[in-house]
Amino acid sequence: MPAPHGLSPLSKAFLMRRAFQRRILPHSLAMALSLPLAGYVQAQEVEFDIPPQALGSALQEFGRQADIQVLYRPEEVRNKRSSAIKGKLEPNQAITELLRGTGASVDFQGNAITISVAEAADSSVDLGATMITSNQLGTITEDSGSYTPGTIATATRLVLTPRETPQSITVVTRQNMDDFGLNNIDDVMRHTPGITVSAYDTDRNNYYARGFSINNFQYDGIPSTARNVGYSAGNTLSDMAIYDRVEVLKGATGLLTGAGSLGATINLIRKKPTHEFKGHVELGAGSWDNYRSELDVSGPLTESGNVRGRAVAAYQDKHSFMDHYERKTSVYYGILEFDLNPDTMLTVGADYQDNDPKGSGWSGSFPLFDSQGNRNDVSRSFNNGAKWSSWEQYTRTVFANLEHNFANGWVGKVQLDHKINGYHAPLGAIMGDWPAPDNSAKIVAQKYTGETKSNSLDIYLTGPFQFLGREHELVVGTSASFSHWEGKSYWNLRNYDNTTDDFINWDGDIGKPDWGTPSQYIDDKTRQLGSYMTARFNVTDDLNLFLGGRVVDYRVTGLNPTIRESGRFIPYVGAVYDLNDTYSVYASYTDIFMPQDSWYRDSSNKLLEPDEGQNYEIGIKGEYLDGRLNTSLAYFEIHEENRAEEDALYNSKPTNPAITYAYKGIKAKTKGYEAEISGELAPGWQVQAGYTHKIIRDDSGKKVSTWEPQDQLSLYTSYKFKGALDKLTVGGGARWQGKSWQMVYNNPRSRWEKFSQEDYWLVDLMARYQITDKLSASVNVNNVFDKTYYTNIGFYTSASYGDPRNLMFSTRWDF
């Protein structure tokens, strides 16, 4: 039916929404627009296809597809998410389904509908368990088609939009991962603006943000035990098949994590069961015999839908551009949701992940110097590892959550998590200053085995409260985590021939040693207890003030001397001021601390004081198109104390009776700025891009963390065509980083040498074609121009190359 007065339904909805928001819409005008079409809303069936998304954008799309005027106040639907509707429905049925679980009601007036949301204190709307789950972790990104999130809760445990959050945060959504084939956490981090991925070797990567290694991981908001980067033990191997999105909160995050890194926290949000039956099968094949398969099935398990489940399995078998290296990974995931009553939901689940490599490189992929101190020049395919070398790692997790919706908008949640991270690593690789003049070389062979068992508990309450005539929000909670790391190391080998005669043509063929008895034992127990609180005070309609803090007790006991921090207080202060309906300015302050690893000892053999620092941040954020597009610009400073640095003066002495190698704690300061944009630029056009600049200097003014580039740029985008090409989606992106360098000690020549990685671009492309409604085919091309670059220089005087050009073809069937 044509729109009266020559206005499209979307234009009418926009104009009437503005009038409605300002309360100046005359009743006669509303009647004049709606009377010619009275009764239409309830009368005709319409073909709908609206995926879950921000409620404001869903209402606009509903108005367009139904040719109906939709009136609503933007502030009432902000932070809410629609349900999906698909198929032939009467508009009144469709809008009811669209609004399910939002707390919104609809009033029909001919061909116009008015959406309203009751005040929380007076609402009798049934807040179902699905809504609670979604809101407490933020909005689900799966099936949204978006590169930006709706709401997030990583920063303060309060559920906020990116614009309302007084810290920088980047979210890599499910759509972004699917478009660019981001199948593991390493891939996701490489696409995350402001993050540097440094490869220690074939199976260990480290992530950096704002000049600091990231050791803070969360799973559904539950902090995991801070990982030991040297052993990795699973965190950096997470397969993305089981996750809805990855949230990266930049800067100090002590409010919810307690002890941890100053750089960032990575929060992996698991996929949840759906109310409708759905699933997919995906198969892929790519460069270097890279094969991957994935199965995902979800839906209700009872007729009423009060029990829902989801199962995911993925398997990958891949070789590499590196000689004699291959890796098999497998992941299995299951989750169940039980609606115990209309206000209470129980969630239980488990996941199982294995990483089984062969031919693992160790401490880089090739040595930088030969025995004469000359720089080695080897091909990208060179692999220093023996064929039997394997850094096998695994993760086992079981978890349970209980959520209850109390009266007046309050929600309580109890979360339990049990995790086992393990490794079994018989390792052999050419390490040191090789080859000799006769082209011979020696390998270093050692074995590491171990397992960390951890248990985490988090309990919190959140909800609104009244103070001085205004409504505010509060979160109060407590958490506890316990972990036990047991390990063995083997390196005292006897009668082992570790020599190869041909370094240049090394193919990994060498005998495996008899490991004998352990040379070292690890038996560390870590306990962290904490209580936290955050309040969001609505000081005025435009100003929100955040006040909070955490009290931490942290203790490590074991074979090394006990490390303890008791009653440590971590403050959190933030403010957000709305300049208008689009832009907000913000400022925040918080800090964090992390006890030093046991080998960071001073010249008196005393463990260094905990690394600690304060994070200051100011910025401006923008929100466009009802939250479908978000922007941010931030300036930050991090003031660090007790950064571990080599004590060069002490270590240069010929004899050191107290300790052979000493460190000292120094002060350092990071200054930088970030700009980011994510979301929908226009219908069908998604983007995520960011630029980061930072400089880290110690208290003498010298630059530190120079291997992490000062400048980084990331841009990824996709476009779904309309009209005759509406089955085609194309996309691409690029990552650029400025020059970085590392000082490496040349032992044969007894001097330090500077190794640099010049600035470089990496370009990726993707395309997807929707063959049928259920079947699609995709291709991803990474490093299109086959750029040669290093992902690490200097780790044990070695280096590692990044991946050359590679392709991946995949096909997906949805059901």
Swiss-Prot record:
GO terms for biological process: pyoverdine biosynthetic process; siderophore-dependent iron import into cell. It is a multi-pass membrane protein. PROSITE patterns: TONB_DEPENDENT_REC_2, TONB_DEPENDENT_REC_3. GO terms for cellular component: cell outer membrane; membrane. Residues 276-815 form the TBDR beta-barrel domain. A motif (TonB C-terminal box) lies at residues 798-815. It holds the Pfam family TonB_dep_Rec_b-barrel. Residues 161-271 form the TBDR plug domain. NCBIfam families: TonB-siderophor. Receptor for the siderophore ferripyoverdine. This is Ferripyoverdine receptor. The gene is fpvA.
